[in-house]
């Protein structure tokens, strides 16, 4: 059963469970989980990012590269998880560490292609970066600044995320939570040509 809603121009259809006959939601939204998994895959390939996330000491970047098991523990559900495919991180106050979480938002049909097809959409892919204030300083600079730089290097301009199109930074804002004991950034990558 389709749920139909009207947008501000009263002519945009948003279908919740129907597809275009090729297994794809008409707005391309059925692949959110796959896109997040692919983004995590790209992030964990960045050795400097993994060191900054895993080691809570000022010399994090001069520490040894992480083992596959250490990286796996950072993304697997459990007490050592530091990379989440959703925004909420419940164990902030229990450990002095850094976290990455993500979400997708503001997806809508791309106006430029609307005359031809409603299968093209645009939206934002948000990455949230947080570090405990007690481990913020490193020998090379502020931890969250360095993490932001490595996330940017890993994802900006990337065009291989499962049909997601080319990513480009659209917005970046400071982010402070838990009574300012954790700080960092949110960075929004604009998805330029979802199909």
What does each model-found stretch correspond to?
Residues 1-113:
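Small/polar-rich, solvent-exposed N-terminal microdomains that initiate assembly or binding
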Residues 93, 112-120, 178-180:
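Short, solvent-exposed beta-strand/turn "edge" segments of beta-rich domains on protein surfaces
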Residues 100, 123-125, 185-187:
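Hydrophobic residues positioned within well-ordered beta-strands of beta-sheet architectures
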Residues 101-105, 128-130, 190:
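Residues in well-ordered beta-strands of folded domains
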Residues 109-115, 132-137, 194-195:
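Short, cysteine-centered beta-strand-loop-beta hairpins and adjacent loop/turn segments enriched
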Residues 115-122, 139-148:
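"Short basic amphipathic alpha-helical interaction patches in structured regions
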Residues 120-136:
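Short acidic, glycine/tyrosine-flanked loop/strand segments centered on an H-E-D-like triad
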Residues 141-195:
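Acidic-leaning, charged glycine-interspersed low-complexity segments
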